[in-house]
Amino acid sequence: MTCKNTRRLYQIITTFLRYGIDEIIPDIPLTRHARLGRKALFWVRNQHKDQPFGVRLRLALQELGPVWIKLGQMLSTRRDLFEPELAEQLALLQDSVEPFDGKSARQIIEQALGGSLETWFDEFDEQALASASIAQVHTAKFNQNQPLVGKDVVIKVIRPDIEPIIKADIALMYRLASWVPRLSNDARRLRATEVVREYEKTLLDELDLTREMANAIRLRNNFENSEMLYVPEMYPDFCHKNVIVMERIYGILVSDVETLKANGTDMKLLAERGVQVFFTQVFRDSFFHADMHAGNIFVNPNHPENPQYIGIDCGIVGTLNQNDKRYLAESFVAFFNRDYRRVALMHVESGWTPADTDIDAFEQAFREVCEPIFAKPLSEISFGHVLLNLFNVAREFNMEVQPQLVLLQKTLLYIEGLGRQVYPQLDLWQTAKPFLQNWLNEQVGVKAILRDLKQRAPQFREHFAEFPEAVFNALQQQKQINFRLDELNKTLQAQGRQKSHNVRSIVSGVIILGVLWRFDDLPLWLSCGTLVTVLLVLLLQRKS
């Protein structure tokens, strides 16, 4: 470890000690090195004893700087790991820092674009429109040299020298996380190293603005011509790893309820559309904006009777596969049907909990945690908290962490919070129910079978020529085996007809298994067709 890193580690540890964060260490025997380390810092005492632990942790992270602030923000969404009071304190962390010099921003942009800003833009504002720990944004207009002359744009630029700072602090986070499992069994359950790894990926992805560009383009295409959501246009010719240029939007922050009402916005429809946008992303597109907090969501001021969301900052997104979506849909439907056994089976069938899990105990654990939720009317039940309760129970049964579902649960909490802030009477279940039912019907109904046949048609055609040969070979093998069986039967006649029949059945079963094994790489319908043919032949021969 370098001297610089050692100094930073010392600063981190003493900051935590000054805020009394070491109280989370239980009264257990510490290692010799840990005891010596704490004694060496005997003079660093908790200077904020009058504050609750959650407040002290928030203040400590705030003091340590942007990388730790963003870690706290991420941890605030992991309500499967922390008490609600602690998560709520961490959610108060604000990723807002002083902007860096506008002239430096100009130099970075010009270096990325390969020329003077005046080549492409007019009215570049060196005063940042907004500033955060990773990047800041400036406004400008396309000049007469561009096809979109006069178009208002926003230029986002990564902070200079932020990457080495992030990587250095991440390395120290890994070192601290490696100590956590040694504290207690509860500390081991936090899987601190896994949390840091997840955070590292999220943070490093945010440093590459071309990812944000690609995500925004994909989301924009998914909602092209949609009345529900508008995503600003990206200008790929001007986008690089540390600089992107996008359309500037003008809207009302979704959290500014008074302005929305003053503008005549249909608040009920706006709240319902927020839920519809989320479930459309999840079940139709398998791709969702995973950072939908109030600062990233605006409402188009035009046509307030038909409100449209505007989404920005696509740096963090989530993707789902069919198994994820099936888990989500079936778990919600089973929960609202109070079918806790189905909920338990879903976790095992998905492979996220061990196959030898005690289903009865699993079901009972879900029942004990989820049943009290129904003391509320259905319209007041939070999907995000339902999912959180499912995660908490599943973790007790050794469920593997599913980062994509953690992202989804965080986003769902954002959507619910914004929806009920806009329209407190929002009925989430009635709004979401059609999406869940339609998706399940499409996956298991006649439509799903027809769609699967259509998708597999080229594969069917490719293997169809093999079908007659497969049947012929199976019949030839059966003919040869029958001859041998006849010889064997003569020998076994003295031992009774029943034994002969048993031998024929056993050998026929071996033939069937052999045929299935030989064609295990064929489509299901072709393998089944071959099997049915062989069974018919065997049946006819038995009758003869």
From Swiss-Prot:
Keyword annotations: ATP-binding, Cell inner membrane, Cell membrane, Kinase, Membrane, Nucleotide-binding, Transferase, Transmembrane, Transmembrane helix, Ubiquinone biosynthesis
The protein's role, per its UniProt record: Is probably a protein kinase regulator of UbiI activity which is involved in aerobic coenzyme Q (ubiquinone) biosynthesis.
Membrane-spanning segments: 522-540
Signal peptide: none
Any single Gene Ontology cellular-component annotation: plasma membrane
Binding, ATP: L129, A130, S131, A132, S133, I134, A135, Q136, V137, K156
Location of this chain's protein in the cell: Cell inner membrane
Gene name of this polypeptide: ubiB
E.C. numbers: 2.7.-.-
The species this protein was found in: Actinobacillus pleuropneumoniae serotype 7 (strain AP76)
Protein name: Probable protein kinase UbiB
A Pfam family recorded for this sequence: ABC1
NCBIfam families, sorted: PRK04750.1, UbiB
Enzyme class: transferase
Keyword Chaperone: no
GO molecular function: ATP binding; protein kinase activity
Biological pathway: Cofactor biosynthesis; ubiquinone biosynthesis [regulation]
Membrane disposition: Single-pass membrane protein
